[in-house]
Amino acid sequence: MFEISFYIALKNFNSLGILKMWRFI
Protein backbone atom coordinates (compact mmCIF):
# COMPACT_ATOMS: atom_id res chain seq x y z
CA MET A 1 0.00 0.00 0.00
CA PHE A 2 2.74 2.40 0.96
CA GLU A 3 4.68 1.56 -2.18
CA ILE A 4 1.69 2.44 -4.36
CA SER A 5 1.22 5.77 -2.60
CA PHE A 6 4.90 6.53 -3.02
CA TYR A 7 4.71 5.76 -6.74
CA ILE A 8 1.67 8.03 -7.19
CA ALA A 9 3.36 10.77 -5.20
CA LEU A 10 6.41 10.50 -7.44
CA LYS A 11 4.27 11.00 -10.53
CA ASN A 12 2.03 13.65 -8.99
CA PHE A 13 4.68 15.46 -6.99
CA ASN A 14 8.26 16.11 -8.11
CA SER A 15 11.70 15.05 -6.91
CA LEU A 16 11.31 17.67 -4.18
CA GLY A 17 8.01 16.21 -3.05
CA ILE A 18 9.58 12.77 -2.86
CA LEU A 19 12.49 14.05 -0.81
CA LYS A 20 10.07 15.68 1.62
CA MET A 21 7.95 12.53 1.84
CA TRP A 22 11.02 10.40 2.38
CA ARG A 23 11.97 12.58 5.34
CA PHE A 24 8.46 12.30 6.74
CA ILE A 25 8.63 8.52 6.56
From Swiss-Prot:
Keywords: Chloroplast, Plastid
Compartments (UniProt record): Plastid, Chloroplast
Chief location bin: plastid
Entry's Gene Ontology cellular component terms: chloroplast
UniProt entry tagged with the keyword Plastid: yes
Protein's name in the database: Uncharacterized 3.1 kDa protein in psbJ-trnE intergenic region
Organism of derivation: Trieres chinensis
